[in-house]
Each structure stands twice: as C-alpha cells, then as structure tokens.
C-alpha cells in the first residue's frame, strides 16, 4: 500500500499525477483480502498497464493494479487449445508466449501495450483481429468479494467495447481471461501493408507474422517510453451506407472497410490528416507526424492539454466531414 503514489510509470501518456492510495495484489485471495480489510476506499479505479488512460488530475482515491500472472492450459484437442491467463500478464509477453508455442490467433495483436485483463475490458483489436473472437470466458471478482465467470456471450462485446466498461460494472475486477487458440495454421493477412511486408520473407510462419506486425507498428507508432502516448486515441467511426456514399462522392480517394451491407468503417486517422492536423501541436500536446490517429505528449503535457488538442481535432473533423469521432482513451 502506497500513499500519494506517483502514477507517472502507470500511464503511457506520461502524465505526472498521483493517487491518494495505490494497492497491488498478486492473487484473487490477496484482492479479496484488500477488499475485506476496508483499504479499498471510494472512489476507486482498477488499472492495467495504463495504456488506454488519460489522467486529467491527481486521483483522490484508491488505484488498484493486478499482478496476477501465469498461463495455464485448461483444455486441448488436436485442433485448438484453451489457456487461462492472469489479468496482470503483460499482453505482448502473452502474444510472444503463444507464438513461441505455435498457437495461432493473437499474433496480429503483437506490440499492443497493456495487460491481459484490460484486453478483455477494451476488446483490443488490430489488423483484422479482435480479442473477442478468441476469448472463451472472463473471470472476475467484485467489490463485495463475489466471484463471477462471464461466458464470452455475456460480455457484450462490440468495437472497442464490453459490459466491463459500463459505469455499473466499475466495481467488477477482471482476474483471469481464457482464450481459445488454434494449433492449426490460420492467418489473417488481409491488410495490404501486411501482405507487402510478408513478400520480403521466403514463407509465412507465426514468428514472421509477429515480426512484420511489430515492424509496421514501430514504424507508425511512437514508443511511449520516448514520447508519451496511448496508441490510437480515437476510434474509427462506423457510418451508414447512405452517409458513406455521399462522402465517397466528395472524397473518392477515401479509404474504407466494409462492416456489412449497411455499415462502413472510415479511418479516423485519414480524416484527421485531411484536416491538416498530422504533425501539428497545440502547446505540449501534438498529433503524431507519422500516424494522425495518435496524440502525443511532447513533454510536460497535462491531461487538459491533451483534451484541448482532442477537442480541436474533433471539431475540425466534424466541420469537414460531418462525422463525430470519439476518443478510444478513457479520461480519468
């Protein structure tokens, strides 16, 4: 237990704030003990790697952080394998663990920052893969010390969303996540960038795909250890067919991804770039010069600086395209 604990190393934006109280635990029993001791005082917030948070001020309450580790095989057939993973496991360590064992499914999610528990809360995704399609169940403990296991069908997954993000589930803490992975070769290589990079290699393997994904991400995205950021700051908007066709008529070069016959996803980064924001700064916060979807802390930025930039970018996109883009990052 730490009082007035600095959160600088617990948020990838590098915002220098503190928590009134900081508690870590390494098992479900430890978490239950903390709850039973009365040390988890309201307000409270459970964080993972802090890679999807923007702290706007000091947190006048209790921050909880899981250090539950371990990867355990709980079921296996000739075709697939189910693993139960502690919520405190670093996500990319888990991806590497799977790739080394030739388990297919998570390789496209390489180098995404954060921890396993948060992956299930946020429904992380990249390059045609969403974690909801791999999750089997999510184990939780609530603020009253009660355990509950959610089948994936109960998790309410949609684009970067789940029931765990709802205000009424703020008191539900993820402890373990189980994933089903394939033992058979199964790749998702539909994104053009991936296919182009794979041409540099003599063949496709899990290790090669992971290396390609890492190379693509490192080229586009700044290292938060060097320049504070939370990865993609905005969600890609999904619009109806009629609105999409009107936009396409005006901007025939606009990239897009078909969701279904009625809905189309438009890259927010492209729209931000078209508004002239790529590489531009507003005080100590800026739009990254290689990926307009990413907002960065150039040094010494406060949460309010990032929000001011976010608001300005959103206003520009709304004025030019008539589309509201929404932050993927959670403001605290």
Swiss-Prot record:
Alphabetical UniProt keywords:
Cell cycle, Cell division, Cell shape, Cell wall biogenesis/degradation, Cytoplasm, FAD, Flavoprotein, NADP, Oxidoreductase, Peptidoglycan synthesis
The molecular function GO annotations come to: FAD binding; UDP-N-acetylmuramate dehydrogenase activity
Query: Would you identify the family this protein belongs to, as annotated?
Result: Belongs to the MurB family.
Q: Which GO terms describe its cellular component?
A: cytosol
Pfam families, sorted: FAD_binding_4, MurB_C
Name the EC number(s).
1.3.1.98
Q: Which organism is it from?
A: Bacteroides fragilis (strain ATCC 25285 / DSM 2151 / CCUG 4856 / JCM 11019 / LMG 10263 / NCTC 9343 / Onslow / VPI 2553 / EN-2)
Cell compartment(s), UniProt: Cytoplasm
- Kindly state which reaction or reactions the protein catalyses: UDP-N-acetyl-alpha-D-muramate + NADP(+) = UDP-N-acetyl-3-O-(1-carboxyvinyl)-alpha-D-glucosamine + NADPH + H(+)
Q: Where is the active site?
A: 160, 232, 328
Question: Its Gene Ontology biological processes?
Answer: cell division; cell wall organization; peptidoglycan biosynthetic process; regulation of cell shape
Q: Which InterPro entries match?
A: FAD-bd_PCMH, FAD-bd_PCMH-like_sf, FAD-bd_PCMH_sub1, FAD-bd_PCMH_sub2, MurB, MurB_C, MurB_C_sf, Oxid_FAD_bind_N
Protein name (Swiss-Prot/TrEMBL)? UDP-N-acetylenolpyruvoylglucosamine reductase
Q: Which cofactor does it need?
A: FAD
Pathway(s) this gene product operates in, as recorded in its UniProt entry: Cell wall biogenesis; peptidoglycan biosynthesis
Q: Which gene encodes it?
A: murB
Highest taxon listed in the record's lineage: Bacteria
Boundaries of each FAD-binding PCMH-type domain copy? 15-184
Tell me, what does this protein do in biology? Cell wall formation.
For this protein, the record's Gene3D superfamilies field holds:
3.30.465.10, UDP-N-acetylenolpyruvoylglucosamine reductase, C-terminal domain, Uridine Diphospho-n-acetylenolpyruvylglucosamine Reductase, domain 2
Q: What is its main location?
A: cytoplasm
């Amino acid at each position: 237990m730490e009082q007035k604990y600095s959160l600088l190393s617990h948020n990838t934006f590098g915002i220098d704030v503190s928590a009134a109280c900081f508690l870590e635990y390494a098992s479900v029993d430890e978490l239950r003990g903390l709850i039973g001791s009365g040390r988890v005082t309201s307000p409270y917030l459970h964080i993972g790697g802090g890679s999807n948070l923007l702290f706007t001020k000091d947190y006048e309450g209790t921050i909880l952080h899981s250090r539950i580790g371990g990867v355990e095989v709980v079921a296996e057939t000739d075709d697939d394998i189910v693993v139960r993973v502690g919520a405190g496991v670093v996500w990319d360590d888990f991806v590497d663990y799977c790739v080394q064992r030739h388990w297919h499914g998570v390789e496209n999610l390489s180098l995404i920052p954060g921890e396993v528990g948060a992956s299930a809360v946020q429904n992380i995704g990249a390059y045609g893969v969403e974690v909801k399609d791999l999750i089997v169940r999510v184990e939780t403990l609530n603020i009253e010390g009660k355990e509950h296991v959610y089948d994936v069908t109960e998790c309410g997954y949609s684009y970067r969303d789940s029931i765990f993000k709802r205000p009424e589930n703020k008191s539900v803490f993820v402890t373990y996540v189980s994933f089903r992975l394939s033992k058979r070769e199964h790749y998702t290589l539909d994104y053009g960038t991936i296919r182009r990079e794979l041409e540099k290699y003599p063949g496709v393997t899990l290790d090669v795909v992971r290396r390609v994904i890492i190379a693509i991400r490192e080229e586009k995205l700044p290292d938060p250890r060097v320049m504070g950021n939370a990865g993609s700051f905005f969600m890609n908007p999904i619009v109806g067919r009629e609105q999409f066709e009107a936009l396409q008529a005006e901007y025939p070069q606009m990239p897009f991804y078909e969701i279904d016959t009625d809905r189309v996803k438009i890259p927010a980064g492209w729209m931000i770039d078209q508004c002239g924001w790529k590489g531009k700064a507003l005080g100590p916060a800026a739009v990254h010069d290689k990926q307009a979807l990413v907002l960065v802390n150039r040094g010494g930025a406060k949460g309010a600086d990032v929000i001011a930039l976010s608001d300005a970018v959103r206003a520009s996109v709304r004025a030019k395209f008539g589309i509201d883009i929404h932050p993927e990052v959670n403001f605290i």
